[in-house]
Amino acid sequence: MKILVTGAKGFVGKNLCAQLNNIKEGKCVIPGLTGNLEAVYEYDIDSTVEDLDRYCSDCDFVFNLAGVNRPQTPEEFMQGNFGFASLLLDTLKKHGNTCPVMISSSIQATLAGRFGNSEYGRSKKAGEELMFEYGKETGAKVLVYRFPNLFGKWCRPNYNSAVATFCHNIANDLPIQVNDRSVEMELLYIDDLVDEMIAALQGNEHRCAYDGIDVVPVIAGSTSSVIAGSTGDLTGRYCYCPVTHKITLGEIVDLIYSFAEQPKTLMIPEIPENSFAKKLYSTYLSYLPKEKVSFPLKMNVDARGSFTELVHTLNCGQVSINISKPGITKGQHWHNTKWEFFIVVSGHGLIQQRRVGSDEILNFEVSGDKIEAVHMLPGYTHNIINLSDTENLVTVMYCNEIFNPQKPDTYFEPVE
């Protein structure tokens, strides 16, 4: 299978081509695609008409992501969006190539509500109709996607994405402007978009109709029941990405500022799987300047070694790193409710525990050569001893709560 991607150097194009090449090279295994993807043709503004002609002659699927969204004049919208689509389809027809063609449109093409006078929307709508006519004329499968606002890594800031601009500016300590924090946006994450493109490539696209600007999912075989009561085009001829997030500008900005504070607070925010916060955090990190990629941690150093907090969480405690010099014993205390994991990752040591009020000592010999986690039990006084005369003992320590100096829950008592 040979894939043509137009607009390959744009935001969506770069991400899609990267994943397609991962599949082609076997770095990402997609059943049915891995091993069958022969070439990814990347076409962009610096490519030639001859390149397009060659690619259209033997491609098996087209992702048309080329377009104009920031022209010098309104007329360039139609030239860049409708004009190139015409050239692409004419070139495919020249070679008798009726492979499936996907085109990226925009929610503005609905020309509904606030988009009623959008020149960009009109040009995208014209491109859509051209694509539908092409499908009728040639029998080729066409997939028209109306994308909402997009975000993710590699998106150009200060151009066409508020999220990209917010992430870039906050990461670089630059001011941002939010005129109305209550404005709600519908956002599509780039990885979710790419996942849908891969699904479309396999014939598993999600179909929909539109009721104004609202997506109406269409289920194969039950179209009438799904879209009953809607207005407008109800044929399900459009495609859509099923995973989007609706969130206000104020919420977006607050999240990004909380991410920016993480090196100071060590606090990892709540980032559930597939949540908007998880996707936004990854996006924010992609805009960090070099000088912020690494940051210092506060090392509490004394003659015995050091103790450094690494990560705090809102509800799941903290992770720290402890270094003990040769022959040193640390700990000799117990907790009522607090509990810990000690995980030696380098060196050779002994962990001892004794239940308060008992004489029995539990001994655990630990080593970086055989990494294991040892519970520090509530109500048991415990210590950790570096058995080496020459090497430091390095221990990762997880505690179920963040240290609170007002309520340390720590009581000195030697194990022996």
Language model: regions and residue ranges:
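Conserved beta-loop-beta element that borders a ligand/cofactor-binding pocket
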Residues: 129-154, 174-183, 233
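Flexible, glycine-rich beta-alpha linker
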Residues: 110-111, 118-119, 145-164, 174
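N-terminal Rossmann NAD(P)H-binding glycine-rich loop of SDR-like oxidoreductase domains
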Residues: 3-22
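A conserved pocket-lining segment of Rossmann-fold NAD(P)-dependent short-chain dehydrogenase/reductase
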Residues: 148, 165-188, 200, 208, ...
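NAD(P)H-binding glycine-rich loop region in Rossmannoid oxidoreductase-like domains
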Residues: 47-84, 91-93, 108-115
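Substrate-positioning beta->alpha
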Residues: 157-165, 182-202, 250, 254
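Mid/C-terminal beta-alpha module of Rossmann-like enzyme folds, strongest
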Residues: 199-298
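Conserved Rossmann-fold NAD(P)-dependent oxidoreductase catalytic core, especially the SDR/UDP-sugar
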Residues: 86-128, 135-138, 143
